[in-house]
A protein has these predicted regions:
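Short alpha-helical transmembrane segments in multi-pass integral membrane proteins
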Residues: 40-111, 153-198
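Hydrophobic alpha-helical transmembrane segments of integral membrane proteins
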Residues: 24-25, 76, 144-145, 164-165
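Helix-terminus/linker motif at the lipid-water interface of multi-pass membrane proteins
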Residues: 1-18, 24, 42, 82-92, ...
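Transmembrane alpha-helical segments of integral membrane proteins
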Residues: 119, 145-154
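Small-residue-rich hydrophobic transmembrane alpha-helices
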Residues: 15-78, 115-137
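Membrane-helix interface segments
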Residues: 8-11, 131-133, 159-160
Length: 198
């Protein structure tokens, strides 16, 4: 994505730092998603409809809350976090990279709440023993939405600041589709259960 001649080194250096920082948010949400899989799968096995609904509701809410807290922390501490993770950066662009990293954190972390929704729904779908739907959601987040949106921003003159908007946009679009996929999956499961009763 970042093959931009004069801005390439700056963006690649910044992305290298941002990627490490993003993992904090990503893995925090993954832990909740993995916990949700176990709890929800257990209640699906018991066919406890009330507990299933509660697990889904609170699984999504808890993941969004954690993602929201991380977003607030990153927005407030973007500067110190960038400097901390940028300690290993060398070269004449070090100051620019750290400044740009601060910008990238402030912009990209807006999408963490949407990422929390998507990751929680991936966990829910895995608990329902659906393997392809979570894979589709990951592909939407990381490739199908992110790459085209990034390519649009890459063509702009202020690419070093604009390209980071690709992350929250891709996360928001993925969250919307994740919700639709979950609703569709729940309808299919309900229809199958009705047929089994008949």
């Amino acid at each position: 994505i970042f093959n931009l001649s004069q801005d390439a080194e700056l963006i690649n250096g910044t992305y290298g730092i941002y990627y490490k920082i993003q993992q904090i948010a990503l893995f925090s949400c993954f832990r909740l998603s993995n916990t949700l899989i176990s709890l929800l799968a257990f209640n699906i096995g018991l066919n406890n409809k009330d507990r299933i609904k509660e697990c889904i509701k609170w699984g999504i809410i808890d993941t969004v809350i954690v993602a929201g807290i991380i977003t607030i922390i990153f927005e407030v501490l973007a500067g110190p976090i960038s400097k901390l993770f940028g300690l290993t950066t060398t070269g004449e662009n070090k100051g620019q990279i750290i400044t740009l990293c601060e910008t990238s954190i402030r912009i990209a972390s807006i999408g963490y709440v949407f990422m929390g929704i998507s990751l929680a729904i991936q966990g829910i779908l895995q608990a329902y023993r659906k393997a392809l739907s979570p894979l589709l959601i990951s592909t939407l987040r990381l490739i199908i939405f992110l790459v085209p949106v990034s390519l649009i921003f890459v063509r702009q003159s202020n690419v070093v600041n604009l390209v980071w908007w690709a992350f929250p946009i891709a996360e928001a679009l993925t969250a919307v589709l994740s919700i639709l996929i979950l609703k569709f999956t729940e309808k299919i499961i309900a229809v199958k259960k009705e047929k089994q009763v008949i």
